[in-house]
Curated annotation (Swiss-Prot):
One of its GO terms (biological process) is translation. CDD domains: bS6. One of its GO terms (cellular component) is ribonucleoprotein complex. SUPFAM superfamilies: Ribosomal protein S6. This is Small ribosomal subunit protein bS6. Belongs to the bacterial ribosomal protein bS6 family. PANTHER family: MITOCHONDRIAL 28S RIBOSOMAL PROTEIN S6, SMALL RIBOSOMAL SUBUNIT PROTEIN BS6M. It comes from Staphylococcus haemolyticus (strain JCSC1435). Keywords: Ribonucleoprotein, Ribosomal protein, RNA-binding, rRNA-binding. InterPro entries: Ribosomal_bS6 (IPR000529), Ribosomal_bS6_sf (IPR035980), Ribosomal_S6_plastid/chlpt (IPR020814), Transl_elong_EF1B/ribsomal_bS6 (IPR014717). One of its GO terms (molecular function) is structural constituent of ribosome.
Length: 98
């Protein structure tokens, strides 16, 4: 099984309830596609290194998952691209210990 770390940034002008719904939705997508969620971190609101879509800040979230296929990460990326609430994301495959 492969381990992935996914970091995504939610737009800063979102209401708290809507932010929670976005986080639950995208974390649920990862869990529903046959992956195991190892860890979830909410880094809170942080300043961006550069402006993205006229935003200078964003809510950072990090999720670590373990999966044996790419369905979870592919579906996450597909939906994150079309979501107005996520302004940036990155999916990183962690090295396997040998």
């Amino acid at each position: 099984m492969r381990t992935y770390e996914i970091m995504y940034v939610v737009r800063p002008n979102i209401e708290e309830d809507a932010k929670k719904a976005v986080v639950e939705r995208f974390n649920g997508i990862l869990a529903s596609e046959g992956s195991e969620v190892l860890e979830e971190k909410d880094w809170g609101k942080r300043r961006l290194a550069y402006e993205i879509e006229d935003f200078k800040e964003g809510f950072y979230n990090i999720v670590r998952i373990k999966t044996d296929n790419n369905r979870a990460t592919d579906e996450f990326q597909r939906l994150a691209k079309i979501s107005d609430d996520i302004i940036r994301y990155i999916v990183i495959r962690e090295d396997q210990d040998k």
